[in-house]
Amino acid sequence: MSTQIKSRQPFYWGILHGINDLVAGFLLAGYTLTHNYSDSFLFISLYAILGFGGQLPVGFWLDKKKEIRFFAKISLFLLPLSVLLFFVSAEAAIISSGMASAFVHVTGGTICLQ
């Protein structure tokens, strides 16, 4: 990979991070507008557990596997999958979005630290 492309990667992952947060906000807001309080609280909590708590196991996995490309592909697969799932099952979309968030944060952070 050329040095010029590699030097732009943190910028691209920063953009992806913003898109990831936008998608998560859209999914969670859409869910809370159409579901009761207890269901909304449950899925917001589940998103937070997966998205933030999931960063530690994903980080350990990335450290062990040492293949950033594999984790980048997972990130780029899960994020659009979350949007598509929203039209089938909002709950599945939120779960997918939480996992995508963990992968986006860990992979992007690793790329930025290189």
Where in this protein do the model-derived segments appear?
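Membrane-water interface at transmembrane helix exits
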Residues: T32, G59-D63, L113
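Cytoplasmic membrane-interface "Motif A"-like loop-to-helix N-cap segments
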Residues: D63-L76
